[in-house]
Amino acid sequence: MTHSKGRPVTYKTSASPESGGGFVDWTLNLNTIQSDKFLNLLLSMVPVIYQKNQEDRHKKVNGIWQDGLSGAAQTFSKRSEPHLDYHEFSEQAFHSSSSGHTPASCSPKYDDYAGYNYCDGREASETTAMLQDEDLSSEGDDVIVETSQRIPKESSGVMALQILVPFLLAGFGTVSAGMVLDIVQHWEVFKNVTEVFILVPALLGLKGNLEMTLASRLSTAVNVGKMDSPIEKWNLIIGNLALKQVQATVVGFLAAVAAIILGWIPEGKYYLSHSILLCSSSVATAFIASLLQGIIMVGVIVGSKKTGINPDNVATPIAASFGDLITLAILAWISQGLYSCLETYYYISPLVCAFFLALTPIWIIIAAKHPATRTVLHSGWEPVITAMVISSIGGLILDTTVSDPNLVGIVVYTPVINGIGGNLVAIQASRISTYLHLHSIPGELPEEPKGCSYPFRTFFGSGVNNKSAQVLLLFVIPGHLIFLYTIHLMKSGHTSLTVVFVVVYLFAAVLQVFTLLWIADWMVHRFWRKGKDPDSFSIPYLTALGDLLGTALLALSFHFLWLIGDRDGDVGD
Protein backbone atom coordinates (compact mmCIF):
# COMPACT_ATOMS: atom_id res chain seq x y z
CA MET A 1 0.00 0.00 0.00
CA THR A 2 1.28 3.47 -0.73
CA HIS A 3 0.14 6.84 0.47
CA SER A 4 -0.27 9.93 -1.67
CA LYS A 5 3.47 10.48 -1.79
CA GLY A 6 4.11 7.04 -3.22
CA ARG A 7 6.16 5.67 -0.33
CA PRO A 8 5.58 2.13 0.92
CA VAL A 9 3.42 1.74 3.99
CA THR A 10 4.52 -0.66 6.71
CA TYR A 11 3.00 -2.03 9.86
CA LYS A 12 5.34 -2.16 12.85
CA THR A 13 4.29 -3.89 16.03
CA SER A 14 6.09 -4.89 19.19
CA ALA A 15 4.86 -6.67 22.24
CA SER A 16 5.73 -6.06 25.84
CA PRO A 17 7.41 -8.69 27.94
CA GLU A 18 4.31 -8.99 30.05
CA SER A 19 2.43 -10.46 27.12
CA GLY A 20 4.31 -13.65 27.58
CA GLY A 21 5.95 -13.86 24.19
CA GLY A 22 8.94 -11.63 24.61
CA PHE A 23 9.62 -8.85 22.17
CA VAL A 24 8.47 -9.67 18.68
CA ASP A 25 8.87 -7.45 15.62
CA TRP A 26 6.74 -7.90 12.56
CA THR A 27 7.14 -5.73 9.45
CA LEU A 28 4.45 -6.18 6.82
CA ASN A 29 5.13 -4.69 3.40
CA LEU A 30 1.78 -4.42 1.69
CA ASN A 31 1.37 -4.44 -2.07
CA THR A 32 1.34 -1.13 -3.80
CA ILE A 33 -2.13 0.01 -4.74
CA GLN A 34 -2.39 2.41 -7.64
CA SER A 35 -5.93 3.68 -7.91
CA ASP A 36 -7.39 7.11 -8.50
CA LYS A 37 -10.29 6.19 -6.25
CA PHE A 38 -7.90 5.17 -3.47
CA LEU A 39 -5.90 8.39 -3.79
CA ASN A 40 -9.09 10.42 -3.75
CA LEU A 41 -10.10 8.70 -0.54
CA LEU A 42 -6.74 9.53 0.97
CA LEU A 43 -7.02 13.16 -0.03
CA SER A 44 -10.60 13.56 1.14
CA MET A 45 -9.55 13.27 4.81
CA VAL A 46 -13.03 12.08 5.67
CA PRO A 47 -14.00 8.62 6.98
CA VAL A 48 -15.64 6.59 4.23
CA ILE A 49 -17.51 3.34 3.77
CA TYR A 50 -15.73 0.76 1.69
CA GLN A 51 -15.48 -2.99 1.39
CA LYS A 52 -12.23 -4.74 1.98
CA ASN A 53 -11.51 -7.86 -0.03
CA GLN A 54 -11.56 -10.93 2.13
CA GLU A 55 -8.47 -12.30 0.38
CA ASP A 56 -6.43 -9.21 1.31
CA ARG A 57 -7.85 -9.18 4.80
CA HIS A 58 -6.72 -12.73 5.50
CA LYS A 59 -3.43 -12.67 3.60
CA LYS A 60 -0.90 -14.82 5.38
CA VAL A 61 2.49 -13.18 5.85
CA ASN A 62 5.41 -15.08 7.38
CA GLY A 63 3.03 -17.72 8.65
CA ILE A 64 0.92 -15.22 10.56
CA TRP A 65 -2.58 -14.08 9.68
CA GLN A 66 -2.81 -10.30 9.43
CA ASP A 67 -6.22 -10.47 11.05
CA GLY A 68 -5.08 -12.86 13.70
CA LEU A 69 -1.93 -11.62 15.31
CA SER A 70 -1.21 -13.51 18.49
CA GLY A 71 -1.86 -12.18 21.94
CA ALA A 72 1.78 -11.20 22.22
CA ALA A 73 1.15 -8.21 19.98
CA GLN A 74 -1.47 -6.41 22.00
CA THR A 75 0.72 -3.37 22.58
CA PHE A 76 1.82 -1.53 19.47
CA SER A 77 4.57 1.00 19.08
CA LYS A 78 4.40 4.31 17.22
CA ARG A 79 7.16 5.86 15.19
CA SER A 80 7.13 9.60 15.67
CA GLU A 81 8.72 12.02 13.27
CA PRO A 82 8.41 15.73 14.02
CA HIS A 83 7.49 16.69 10.48
CA LEU A 84 4.69 14.15 10.12
CA ASP A 85 1.16 13.95 11.44
CA TYR A 86 -0.30 10.52 11.85
CA HIS A 87 -3.78 9.20 11.50
CA GLU A 88 -4.94 6.08 13.19
CA PHE A 89 -5.70 2.78 11.60
CA SER A 90 -7.94 0.99 14.06
CA GLU A 91 -10.32 -1.90 14.22
CA GLN A 92 -11.58 -1.26 17.69
CA ALA A 93 -15.07 -0.24 16.71
CA PHE A 94 -16.19 -3.58 15.38
CA HIS A 95 -13.64 -6.12 16.63
CA SER A 96 -13.19 -5.42 20.33
CA SER A 97 -12.22 -8.22 22.61
CA SER A 98 -15.22 -8.02 24.89
CA SER A 99 -17.57 -9.08 22.13
CA GLY A 100 -15.71 -12.30 21.66
CA HIS A 101 -14.26 -11.25 18.30
CA THR A 102 -10.65 -10.92 19.27
CA PRO A 103 -8.13 -11.20 16.46
CA ALA A 104 -6.67 -14.25 18.13
CA SER A 105 -9.97 -16.07 18.19
CA CYS A 106 -11.24 -15.65 14.64
CA SER A 107 -14.02 -18.08 13.94
CA PRO A 108 -15.77 -18.89 10.65
CA LYS A 109 -18.69 -16.80 11.86
CA TYR A 110 -16.38 -13.88 12.47
CA ASP A 111 -14.60 -14.42 9.18
CA ASP A 112 -17.89 -13.97 7.38
CA TYR A 113 -17.92 -10.38 8.53
CA ALA A 114 -14.41 -9.64 7.38
CA GLY A 115 -15.44 -8.58 3.90
CA TYR A 116 -18.89 -7.41 4.80
CA ASN A 117 -20.02 -3.98 3.73
CA TYR A 118 -22.11 -2.70 6.59
CA CYS A 119 -24.21 -0.61 4.25
CA ASP A 120 -25.44 -3.43 2.02
CA GLY A 121 -29.07 -4.08 2.69
CA ARG A 122 -29.00 -1.90 5.77
CA GLU A 123 -29.63 1.70 6.67
CA ALA A 124 -26.38 3.58 6.32
CA SER A 125 -25.71 6.41 8.70
CA GLU A 126 -23.06 8.92 9.58
CA THR A 127 -21.72 6.92 12.49
CA THR A 128 -21.69 3.80 10.35
CA ALA A 129 -19.40 5.59 7.92
CA MET A 130 -17.40 7.02 10.75
CA LEU A 131 -16.79 3.74 12.54
CA GLN A 132 -15.80 1.34 9.80
CA ASP A 133 -12.95 -1.06 10.41
CA GLU A 134 -10.22 1.14 9.00
CA ASP A 135 -9.64 4.83 8.33
CA LEU A 136 -7.42 5.92 5.46
CA SER A 137 -5.44 9.13 5.47
CA SER A 138 -2.91 10.91 3.28
CA GLU A 139 -1.14 12.88 5.98
CA GLY A 140 1.27 10.27 7.25
CA ASP A 141 3.94 8.09 5.74
CA ASP A 142 3.00 5.16 7.96
CA VAL A 143 -0.20 3.53 9.01
CA ILE A 144 -0.21 2.92 12.72
CA VAL A 145 -2.07 0.11 14.39
CA GLU A 146 -3.42 0.81 17.86
CA THR A 147 -5.12 -1.22 20.49
CA SER A 148 -8.84 -0.92 21.11
CA GLN A 149 -9.89 2.25 22.86
CA ARG A 150 -11.99 2.00 25.93
CA ILE A 151 -14.03 4.49 27.88
CA PRO A 152 -12.49 4.85 31.35
CA LYS A 153 -14.41 2.92 33.96
CA GLU A 154 -16.62 5.16 36.03
CA SER A 155 -18.45 4.42 39.24
CA SER A 156 -22.07 5.34 39.82
CA GLY A 157 -20.91 8.27 41.95
CA VAL A 158 -18.61 9.66 39.27
CA MET A 159 -21.33 9.22 36.67
CA ALA A 160 -23.86 11.03 38.86
CA LEU A 161 -21.46 13.92 39.50
CA GLN A 162 -20.75 14.33 35.79
CA ILE A 163 -24.45 14.28 34.96
CA LEU A 164 -25.60 16.49 37.86
CA VAL A 165 -24.52 19.95 36.68
CA PRO A 166 -25.67 19.54 33.05
CA PHE A 167 -28.91 17.99 34.32
CA LEU A 168 -29.61 20.97 36.58
CA LEU A 169 -28.70 23.42 33.80
CA ALA A 170 -31.04 21.62 31.42
CA GLY A 171 -33.76 21.56 34.07
CA PHE A 172 -33.54 25.27 34.74
CA GLY A 173 -33.61 25.83 31.00
CA THR A 174 -36.89 23.92 30.74
CA VAL A 175 -38.25 25.80 33.77
CA SER A 176 -37.43 29.07 32.02
CA ALA A 177 -39.13 27.81 28.86
CA GLY A 178 -42.21 26.86 30.88
CA MET A 179 -42.41 30.30 32.45
CA VAL A 180 -42.00 31.95 29.04
CA LEU A 181 -44.78 29.76 27.61
CA ASP A 182 -46.98 30.67 30.57
CA ILE A 183 -46.51 34.34 29.66
CA VAL A 184 -46.80 34.17 25.88
CA GLN A 185 -49.96 32.03 25.97
CA HIS A 186 -51.77 35.32 26.60
CA TRP A 187 -50.31 37.01 23.50
CA GLU A 188 -52.63 37.73 20.59
CA VAL A 189 -51.04 35.23 18.22
CA PHE A 190 -51.45 32.38 20.74
CA LYS A 191 -55.05 33.35 21.41
CA ASN A 192 -56.15 33.84 17.80
CA VAL A 193 -53.94 31.25 16.07
CA THR A 194 -54.14 28.40 18.58
CA GLU A 195 -52.34 26.02 16.20
CA VAL A 196 -49.13 27.67 17.45
CA PHE A 197 -49.52 25.50 20.56
CA ILE A 198 -49.29 22.43 18.32
CA LEU A 199 -45.98 23.76 17.00
CA VAL A 200 -44.50 24.09 20.49
CA PRO A 201 -43.74 20.39 21.24
CA ALA A 202 -42.69 19.74 17.64
CA LEU A 203 -40.20 22.63 17.57
CA LEU A 204 -38.98 22.04 21.11
CA GLY A 205 -38.56 18.42 20.04
CA LEU A 206 -35.99 19.52 17.48
CA LYS A 207 -33.42 19.31 20.27
CA GLY A 208 -34.18 15.58 20.39
CA ASN A 209 -34.41 15.17 16.64
CA LEU A 210 -31.30 17.16 15.81
CA GLU A 211 -29.29 18.59 18.71
CA MET A 212 -29.26 15.47 20.87
CA THR A 213 -28.68 13.25 17.85
CA LEU A 214 -25.73 15.44 16.85
CA ALA A 215 -24.43 15.32 20.43
CA SER A 216 -24.74 11.54 20.56
CA ARG A 217 -23.00 11.03 17.19
CA LEU A 218 -20.12 13.34 18.04
CA SER A 219 -19.83 11.83 21.55
CA THR A 220 -19.49 8.39 19.99
CA ALA A 221 -16.87 9.78 17.58
CA VAL A 222 -14.89 11.23 20.48
CA ASN A 223 -15.05 8.03 22.54
CA VAL A 224 -13.80 5.83 19.70
CA GLY A 225 -11.03 8.25 18.74
CA LYS A 226 -12.40 9.53 15.46
CA MET A 227 -11.97 13.22 16.35
CA ASP A 228 -8.30 13.09 17.26
CA SER A 229 -7.22 14.45 13.89
CA PRO A 230 -8.05 18.17 13.46
CA ILE A 231 -8.95 17.68 9.79
CA GLU A 232 -11.26 14.75 10.49
CA LYS A 233 -12.77 16.64 13.41
CA TRP A 234 -13.66 19.73 11.40
CA ASN A 235 -14.89 17.69 8.45
CA LEU A 236 -17.31 15.92 10.78
CA ILE A 237 -18.38 19.18 12.45
CA ILE A 238 -18.99 21.12 9.23
CA GLY A 239 -20.80 18.24 7.57
CA ASN A 240 -22.99 17.69 10.62
CA LEU A 241 -23.92 21.35 10.99
CA ALA A 242 -24.88 21.60 7.31
CA LEU A 243 -26.89 18.39 7.56
CA LYS A 244 -28.63 19.68 10.67
CA GLN A 245 -29.69 22.90 8.93
CA VAL A 246 -31.24 20.87 6.09
CA GLN A 247 -33.14 18.72 8.55
CA ALA A 248 -34.22 21.70 10.67
CA THR A 249 -35.67 23.54 7.67
CA VAL A 250 -37.53 20.51 6.34
CA VAL A 251 -38.82 19.44 9.75
CA GLY A 252 -39.89 23.01 10.54
CA PHE A 253 -41.94 23.16 7.35
CA LEU A 254 -43.49 19.73 7.90
CA ALA A 255 -44.30 20.62 11.52
CA ALA A 256 -46.25 23.62 10.29
CA VAL A 257 -48.15 21.43 7.80
CA ALA A 258 -48.95 18.96 10.59
CA ALA A 259 -50.13 21.79 12.85
CA ILE A 260 -52.40 23.12 10.10
CA ILE A 261 -53.95 19.69 9.51
CA LEU A 262 -54.33 18.82 13.19
CA GLY A 263 -55.79 22.26 13.90
CA TRP A 264 -58.27 21.95 11.04
CA ILE A 265 -59.59 18.50 11.98
CA PRO A 266 -61.49 19.38 15.22
CA GLU A 267 -63.36 22.45 13.95
CA GLY A 268 -63.11 22.19 10.18
CA LYS A 269 -62.02 25.83 9.84
CA TYR A 270 -59.15 26.90 7.60
CA TYR A 271 -57.51 30.32 7.17
CA LEU A 272 -54.87 30.78 4.47
CA SER A 273 -53.21 33.70 6.24
CA HIS A 274 -52.86 31.64 9.41
CA SER A 275 -51.34 28.77 7.44
CA ILE A 276 -48.70 31.03 5.87
CA LEU A 277 -47.99 32.52 9.28
CA LEU A 278 -47.47 29.06 10.79
CA CYS A 279 -45.13 27.98 7.97
CA SER A 280 -43.02 31.13 8.19
CA SER A 281 -42.79 31.08 11.98
CA SER A 282 -41.96 27.38 12.12
CA VAL A 283 -39.29 27.39 9.39
CA ALA A 284 -37.58 30.55 10.65
CA THR A 285 -37.61 29.34 14.26
CA ALA A 286 -36.28 25.89 13.39
CA PHE A 287 -33.48 27.32 11.24
CA ILE A 288 -32.26 30.01 13.65
CA ALA A 289 -32.59 27.92 16.82
CA SER A 290 -30.89 24.91 15.24
CA LEU A 291 -27.93 26.98 14.05
CA LEU A 292 -27.39 28.61 17.44
CA GLN A 293 -27.73 25.36 19.37
CA GLY A 294 -25.52 23.47 16.92
CA ILE A 295 -22.65 25.90 17.43
CA ILE A 296 -23.06 25.63 21.21
CA MET A 297 -23.16 21.85 20.95
CA VAL A 298 -19.91 21.63 19.00
CA GLY A 299 -18.23 23.77 21.65
CA VAL A 300 -19.48 21.46 24.40
CA ILE A 301 -18.21 18.32 22.62
CA VAL A 302 -14.77 19.79 21.92
CA GLY A 303 -14.54 21.17 25.45
CA SER A 304 -15.51 17.82 26.98
CA LYS A 305 -12.79 16.08 24.98
CA LYS A 306 -10.13 18.54 26.12
CA THR A 307 -11.14 18.35 29.80
CA GLY A 308 -11.35 14.55 29.85
CA ILE A 309 -15.08 14.41 30.66
CA ASN A 310 -17.15 11.68 29.03
CA PRO A 311 -19.27 13.66 26.50
CA ASP A 312 -22.01 11.02 26.70
CA ASN A 313 -22.75 12.25 30.23
CA VAL A 314 -22.80 15.98 29.57
CA ALA A 315 -23.41 16.67 25.88
CA THR A 316 -27.06 15.69 25.57
CA PRO A 317 -28.26 17.54 28.70
CA ILE A 318 -26.35 20.68 27.76
CA ALA A 319 -27.77 20.39 24.25
CA ALA A 320 -31.16 20.87 25.87
CA SER A 321 -30.15 23.24 28.68
CA PHE A 322 -31.22 26.42 26.96
CA GLY A 323 -32.52 24.88 23.76
CA ASP A 324 -36.13 24.97 24.89
CA LEU A 325 -35.84 28.56 26.07
CA ILE A 326 -34.12 29.75 22.90
CA THR A 327 -36.55 27.94 20.62
CA LEU A 328 -39.67 29.08 22.46
CA ALA A 329 -38.51 32.69 22.70
CA ILE A 330 -37.70 32.80 18.98
CA LEU A 331 -41.04 31.18 18.09
CA ALA A 332 -43.04 33.62 20.22
CA TRP A 333 -41.16 36.66 18.94
CA ILE A 334 -41.31 35.74 15.24
CA SER A 335 -44.94 34.56 15.27
CA GLN A 336 -46.12 37.66 17.14
CA GLY A 337 -44.17 39.93 14.79
CA LEU A 338 -45.57 38.26 11.67
CA TYR A 339 -49.08 38.27 13.15
CA SER A 340 -48.90 42.03 13.67
CA CYS A 341 -48.00 42.42 9.97
CA LEU A 342 -50.87 40.32 8.59
CA GLU A 343 -53.14 43.26 7.93
CA THR A 344 -50.71 45.87 6.62
CA TYR A 345 -47.70 43.93 5.30
CA TYR A 346 -49.27 40.63 4.29
CA TYR A 347 -46.37 39.75 1.94
CA ILE A 348 -43.75 39.54 4.71
CA SER A 349 -44.78 36.07 5.93
CA PRO A 350 -44.44 34.32 2.55
CA LEU A 351 -41.14 36.12 1.88
CA VAL A 352 -39.68 34.94 5.19
CA CYS A 353 -40.72 31.36 4.47
CA ALA A 354 -39.35 31.49 0.91
CA PHE A 355 -36.02 32.93 2.06
CA PHE A 356 -35.22 30.13 4.51
CA LEU A 357 -36.46 27.43 2.14
CA ALA A 358 -34.22 28.86 -0.61
CA LEU A 359 -31.16 28.30 1.58
CA THR A 360 -31.81 24.56 1.75
CA PRO A 361 -29.98 23.60 -1.50
CA ILE A 362 -26.83 25.34 -0.23
CA TRP A 363 -26.80 23.27 2.95
CA ILE A 364 -27.50 20.12 0.95
CA ILE A 365 -24.46 20.76 -1.26
CA ILE A 366 -22.20 21.30 1.76
CA ALA A 367 -23.48 18.20 3.57
CA ALA A 368 -23.21 16.06 0.42
CA LYS A 369 -19.49 16.86 0.07
CA HIS A 370 -18.77 14.86 3.22
CA PRO A 371 -19.24 11.08 2.86
CA ALA A 372 -19.91 10.74 6.57
CA THR A 373 -23.03 12.93 6.34
CA ARG A 374 -24.01 12.16 2.74
CA THR A 375 -25.51 8.84 3.82
CA VAL A 376 -27.75 10.54 6.39
CA LEU A 377 -29.15 12.82 3.68
CA HIS A 378 -30.67 9.69 2.15
CA SER A 379 -31.41 7.46 5.12
CA GLY A 380 -31.78 9.76 8.12
CA TRP A 381 -35.23 11.20 7.47
CA GLU A 382 -37.47 8.44 8.76
CA PRO A 383 -36.81 8.94 12.50
CA VAL A 384 -36.75 12.74 12.28
CA ILE A 385 -40.07 13.06 10.45
CA THR A 386 -41.77 10.31 12.47
CA ALA A 387 -40.62 11.95 15.70
CA MET A 388 -42.02 15.28 14.51
CA VAL A 389 -45.42 13.67 13.90
CA ILE A 390 -45.39 12.06 17.36
CA SER A 391 -44.48 15.38 19.00
CA SER A 392 -47.23 17.12 17.02
CA ILE A 393 -49.78 14.71 18.49
CA GLY A 394 -48.52 15.78 21.91
CA GLY A 395 -48.99 19.36 20.76
CA LEU A 396 -52.59 18.60 19.83
CA ILE A 397 -53.15 17.27 23.37
CA LEU A 398 -51.62 20.48 24.76
CA ASP A 399 -53.76 22.66 22.49
CA THR A 400 -56.93 20.80 23.53
CA THR A 401 -56.05 20.96 27.24
CA VAL A 402 -55.18 24.66 27.18
CA SER A 403 -58.53 25.36 25.51
CA ASP A 404 -60.19 24.26 28.77
CA PRO A 405 -60.02 27.28 31.13
CA ASN A 406 -59.96 24.92 34.11
CA LEU A 407 -56.73 23.26 32.94
CA VAL A 408 -54.70 26.20 31.70
CA GLY A 409 -52.22 25.63 34.56
CA ILE A 410 -50.68 22.74 32.61
CA VAL A 411 -48.77 25.13 30.35
CA VAL A 412 -45.90 26.02 32.68
CA TYR A 413 -45.15 22.38 33.56
CA THR A 414 -45.29 20.90 30.06
CA PRO A 415 -41.78 21.93 28.92
CA VAL A 416 -40.38 20.84 32.29
CA ILE A 417 -41.70 17.27 32.36
CA ASN A 418 -41.09 16.79 28.64
CA GLY A 419 -37.60 18.26 28.74
CA ILE A 420 -36.39 16.35 31.80
CA GLY A 421 -37.68 13.04 30.47
CA GLY A 422 -36.10 13.63 27.07
CA ASN A 423 -32.76 14.65 28.59
CA LEU A 424 -32.47 11.58 30.80
CA VAL A 425 -33.45 9.08 28.13
CA ALA A 426 -31.08 10.71 25.62
CA ILE A 427 -28.17 10.21 28.03
CA GLN A 428 -29.04 6.53 28.39
CA ALA A 429 -29.45 6.00 24.64
CA SER A 430 -26.13 7.72 23.92
CA ARG A 431 -24.31 5.59 26.49
CA ILE A 432 -25.79 2.31 25.22
CA SER A 433 -24.93 3.29 21.64
CA THR A 434 -21.31 4.01 22.55
CA TYR A 435 -21.13 0.69 24.42
CA LEU A 436 -22.38 -1.21 21.35
CA HIS A 437 -19.98 0.58 19.01
CA LEU A 438 -17.07 -0.45 21.21
CA HIS A 439 -18.12 -4.02 22.00
CA SER A 440 -19.81 -5.38 18.90
CA ILE A 441 -20.40 -5.09 15.18
CA PRO A 442 -23.63 -3.89 13.51
CA GLY A 443 -26.14 -6.70 13.30
CA GLU A 444 -24.72 -8.60 16.27
CA LEU A 445 -25.26 -7.93 19.96
CA PRO A 446 -22.45 -8.38 22.49
CA GLU A 447 -22.66 -11.34 24.80
CA GLU A 448 -24.44 -10.23 27.95
CA PRO A 449 -25.63 -12.23 30.96
CA LYS A 450 -29.23 -13.27 30.60
CA GLY A 451 -31.62 -11.66 33.03
CA CYS A 452 -35.29 -11.00 33.47
CA SER A 453 -37.38 -9.64 30.62
CA TYR A 454 -38.22 -6.01 29.93
CA PRO A 455 -38.81 -3.66 31.62
CA PHE A 456 -37.05 -4.99 34.70
CA ARG A 457 -33.86 -6.17 32.96
CA THR A 458 -33.06 -2.51 32.28
CA PHE A 459 -32.76 -1.67 35.96
CA PHE A 460 -31.63 -4.93 37.59
CA GLY A 461 -28.10 -6.08 36.85
CA SER A 462 -24.46 -5.22 37.37
CA GLY A 463 -23.74 -4.02 33.84
CA VAL A 464 -22.66 -0.46 33.12
CA ASN A 465 -25.94 0.27 31.33
CA ASN A 466 -27.95 -1.09 34.27
CA LYS A 467 -26.09 1.21 36.63
CA SER A 468 -26.64 4.24 34.43
CA ALA A 469 -30.38 3.48 34.22
CA GLN A 470 -30.55 3.28 38.01
CA VAL A 471 -28.67 6.57 38.43
CA LEU A 472 -30.84 8.37 35.88
CA LEU A 473 -34.06 7.13 37.47
CA LEU A 474 -32.86 8.37 40.87
CA PHE A 475 -32.47 11.87 39.41
CA VAL A 476 -36.20 12.20 38.67
CA ILE A 477 -37.75 12.93 42.07
CA PRO A 478 -35.12 15.29 43.56
CA GLY A 479 -34.72 17.04 40.22
CA HIS A 480 -38.42 17.71 39.75
CA LEU A 481 -38.77 18.84 43.37
CA ILE A 482 -36.09 21.47 42.75
CA PHE A 483 -37.76 22.63 39.55
CA LEU A 484 -41.25 22.71 41.07
CA TYR A 485 -39.99 24.80 43.96
CA THR A 486 -38.22 27.14 41.54
CA ILE A 487 -41.47 27.71 39.63
CA HIS A 488 -43.23 28.32 42.95
CA LEU A 489 -40.61 30.88 44.05
CA MET A 490 -40.90 32.72 40.75
CA LYS A 491 -44.67 32.90 41.30
CA SER A 492 -45.25 31.48 37.86
CA GLY A 493 -48.14 29.35 36.69
CA HIS A 494 -51.70 29.01 37.91
CA THR A 495 -51.23 26.12 40.33
CA SER A 496 -50.40 26.01 44.05
CA LEU A 497 -47.99 23.36 45.29
CA THR A 498 -50.29 21.24 47.44
CA VAL A 499 -49.11 17.88 48.73
CA VAL A 500 -51.59 16.06 46.51
CA PHE A 501 -50.46 17.98 43.43
CA VAL A 502 -46.77 17.25 44.12
CA VAL A 503 -47.42 13.52 44.66
CA VAL A 504 -49.51 13.18 41.50
CA TYR A 505 -47.02 15.20 39.45
CA LEU A 506 -44.02 13.17 40.69
CA PHE A 507 -45.84 9.91 39.99
CA ALA A 508 -46.43 11.03 36.40
CA ALA A 509 -42.77 12.09 36.05
CA VAL A 510 -41.37 8.82 37.45
CA LEU A 511 -43.72 6.74 35.29
CA GLN A 512 -42.65 8.70 32.21
CA VAL A 513 -38.89 8.27 32.80
CA PHE A 514 -39.23 4.62 33.87
CA THR A 515 -41.11 3.86 30.66
CA LEU A 516 -38.67 5.80 28.49
CA LEU A 517 -35.57 4.13 29.96
CA TRP A 518 -36.70 0.56 29.32
CA ILE A 519 -37.99 1.50 25.87
CA ALA A 520 -34.56 3.03 25.17
CA ASP A 521 -32.80 -0.16 26.25
CA TRP A 522 -35.02 -2.24 23.98
CA MET A 523 -35.02 0.19 21.04
CA VAL A 524 -31.26 0.87 20.88
CA HIS A 525 -30.46 -2.85 20.90
CA ARG A 526 -33.13 -3.51 18.29
CA PHE A 527 -31.81 -0.87 15.92
CA TRP A 528 -28.27 -2.18 16.39
CA ARG A 529 -29.37 -5.74 15.66
CA LYS A 530 -31.02 -4.50 12.43
CA GLY A 531 -27.78 -2.77 11.40
CA LYS A 532 -29.06 0.77 11.96
CA ASP A 533 -27.11 3.41 13.84
CA PRO A 534 -28.79 4.00 17.23
CA ASP A 535 -27.33 7.51 17.50
CA SER A 536 -29.31 8.63 14.46
CA PHE A 537 -32.42 6.49 14.84
CA SER A 538 -33.26 6.00 18.52
CA ILE A 539 -32.96 9.45 20.12
CA PRO A 540 -35.52 11.21 17.87
CA TYR A 541 -38.08 8.50 18.61
CA LEU A 542 -37.32 8.50 22.33
CA THR A 543 -37.52 12.26 22.84
CA ALA A 544 -40.72 12.41 20.79
CA LEU A 545 -42.20 9.64 22.92
CA GLY A 546 -41.07 11.64 25.95
CA ASP A 547 -43.04 14.65 24.68
CA LEU A 548 -46.12 12.56 24.00
CA LEU A 549 -45.96 10.63 27.29
CA GLY A 550 -45.18 13.72 29.34
CA THR A 551 -47.99 15.82 27.87
CA ALA A 552 -50.52 12.98 28.08
CA LEU A 553 -49.62 12.02 31.67
CA LEU A 554 -49.63 15.67 32.74
CA ALA A 555 -53.04 16.25 31.16
CA LEU A 556 -54.39 13.15 32.93
CA SER A 557 -52.89 14.37 36.21
CA PHE A 558 -54.59 17.75 35.92
CA HIS A 559 -57.89 16.11 35.03
CA PHE A 560 -57.53 13.80 38.04
CA LEU A 561 -56.71 16.70 40.38
CA TRP A 562 -59.71 18.62 39.13
CA LEU A 563 -62.01 15.63 39.63
CA ILE A 564 -60.87 14.94 43.22
CA GLY A 565 -61.32 18.60 44.11
CA ASP A 566 -57.70 19.63 44.65
CA ARG A 567 -58.29 23.23 43.61
CA ASP A 568 -56.25 25.00 46.22
CA GLY A 569 -55.00 28.10 44.61
CA ASP A 570 -57.03 26.79 42.02
CA VAL A 571 -55.70 24.25 39.57
CA GLY A 572 -56.23 26.07 36.33
CA ASP A 573 -57.47 29.27 37.93
Swiss-Prot record:
Compartments (UniProt record): Cell membrane
Answer whether the UniProt record assigns the keyword DNA damage to this protein: no
State one Pfam family annotation. Answer: MgtE
* Entry-annotated residues carrying Phosphoserine: S137, S138
> What is this protein for, i.e. what is its function?
Acts as a plasma-membrane magnesium transporter. Can also mediate the transport of other divalent metal cations in an order of Ba(2+) > Ni(2+) > Co(2+) > Fe(2+) > Mn(2+).
The UniProt entry's sequence similarity note says: Belongs to the SLC41A transporter family.
Positions in the Extracellular compartment: 1-162, 217-245, 304-313, 369-376, 428-469, 520-543
Any one Gene Ontology biological process term?
A: iron ion transport
Per its record, the protein catalyses: Mg(2+)(in) = Mg(2+)(out); Mn(2+)(in) = Mn(2+)(out); Co(2+)(in) = Co(2+)(out); Ni(2+)(in) = Ni(2+)(out)
Which superkingdom does the taxonomy of this entry point to? Eukaryota
Recorded hits in InterPro entries, A to Z, give: SLC41_membr_dom (IPR006667), SLC41_membr_dom_sf (IPR036739), SLC41A1-3 (IPR045349)
Which residues are connected by disulfide bridges in this protein? none
This chain belongs to the protein called Solute carrier family 41 member 2
Q: Which residues lie on this side of the membrane: Cytoplasmic?
A: 184-195, 267-282, 335-347, 398-406, 491-498, 565-573
Bilayer topology term: Multi-pass membrane protein
Any one cellular component term from GO for this entry?
Answer: plasma membrane
KW Acetylation (keyword) present = no
Record keywords, A-Z: Cell membrane, Ion transport, Magnesium, Membrane, Phosphoprotein, Repeat, Transmembrane, Transmembrane helix, Transport
- Taxonomic path: Eukaryota, Metazoa, Chordata, Craniata, Vertebrata
Q: What is its main location?
A: membrane
Query: Which sequence ranges are marked TM in the entry?
Result: 163-183, 196-216, 246-266, 283-303, 314-334, 348-368, 377-397, 407-427, 470-490, 499-519, 544-564
